[in-house]
């Protein structure tokens, strides 16, 4: 279900501060965040985020195709292990 247009896009204010600081600096250190609900904006392109999946932080490199999506979409929380085949 998509977000209402009258509400607008959402990004955590502390995450926006970190992005502005990263864009101003030369170092390309990953930005660690727990905010999976934040939407990806155009000024995030080219940055690397460490998104928490509930257990560990997964590195996500943001490209232009990701704009408008949420950070959490690129850090899966569940890992499916294949069903074992019955031995005969």
From Swiss-Prot:
User: A single Gene Ontology molecular function, please?
Assistant: structural constituent of ribosome
**Keywords, in A-Z order:** Ribonucleoprotein, Ribosomal protein, RNA-binding, rRNA-binding
Tree of life domain:
Bacteria
Write the gene name: rpsS
Q: Which SUPFAM superfamilies match?
A: Ribosomal protein S19
InterPro entries, sorted: Ribosomal_uS19 (IPR002222), Ribosomal_uS19_bac-type (IPR005732), Ribosomal_uS19_CS (IPR020934), Ribosomal_uS19_SF (IPR023575)
The UniProt entry's GO biological process terms, in alphabetical order, are:
ribosomal small subunit assembly; translation
* Function, in words: Protein S19 forms a complex with S13 that binds strongly to the 16S ribosomal RNA.
The identity of this protein, by name, is Small ribosomal subunit protein uS19
Would you identify the family this protein belongs to, as annotated?
A: Belongs to the universal ribosomal protein uS19 family.
* Any one GO cellular component localisation term in the record: cytoplasm
């Amino acid at each position: 279900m998509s977000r209402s247009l009258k509400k607008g896009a959402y990004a955590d204010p502390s995450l926006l501060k970190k992005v502005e600081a990263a864009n101003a600096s030369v170092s390309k250190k990953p930005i660690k965040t727990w905010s999976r609900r934040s939407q990806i904006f155009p000024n995030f392109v080219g940055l690397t985020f460490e998104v928490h999946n509930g257990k560990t932080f997964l590195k996500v490199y943001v490209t232009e195709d990701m704009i408008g999506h949420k950070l959490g979409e690129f850090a899966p929380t569940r890992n499916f292990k294949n069903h074992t085949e019955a031995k005969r």
